[in-house]
Design a protein with these regions (language model features):
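Residue register of alpha-helical TPR repeats
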Residues: 1-3, 35, 42, 75, ...
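Amphipathic alpha-helical segments of tetratricopeptide repeats
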Residues: 15-26, 59-69
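Residue signature of alpha-solenoid helical repeat architecture, marking inter-repeat boundaries
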Residues: 31-32
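Helix-turn-helix DNA-binding segment
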Residues: 114-145
Length: 145
């Protein structure tokens, strides 16, 4: 539900849903926790709360890295709005490269479904970093941010 709220632009509610689910969990559920932290990161970025976004992304990374559960991170590259680059590119270059490869494969498949269904033609000639910068600019972020 947190992801659905995010997609509807209800970022505050999305964040609240994800954080409440994380607080109320009983036991360890790594896949669910990973997804909830990524959803919270996405919402925080849309709310321009970068510190909270990085904290949730860091928690997601702590869950994902030991077991190589990076597929979800790669699939959410665009929605994470630069967090992968900011948090992993320098400190974890090999993992970053693997995530970006996942992102390219996921995006290729997504465009093959999205373009015919929507009647729009989403371009594929930007790098992941260029795409992130363009998306942040479209959302009103400044270069300094």
């Amino acid at each position: 539900m947190a992801h659905a709220l995010y997609l509807r632009g209800e970022y505050g509610r999305s964040l609240g849903m994800a954080e409440n689910a994380l607080i109320m969990k009983q036991g360890s559920y790594p896949i669910s926790e990973l997804f909830l932290h990524l959803s919270a990161s996405m919402a925080c970025m849309s709310l321009k709360d970068i510190d909270a976004a990085k904290a949730h992304f860091g928690a997601a990374w702590d869950i994902a890295r030991p077991d190589g559960l990076i597929e979800l991170i790669g699939e959410h590259h665009g929605l994470l709005q630069g967090l992968i680059e900011a948090c992993l590119k320098t400190q974890y270059p090999d993992d970053f490269a693997r995530i970006i490869e996942i992102t390219y494969r996921f995006s290729y498949g997504w465009r093959r479904i999205h373009n015919p269904d929507s009647g729009e033609d989403v371009a594929d000639d930007l790098t992941t970093t260029e795409f992130t910068m363009a998306m942040l600019a479209c959302r009103g972020w400044t270069n300094a941010e």
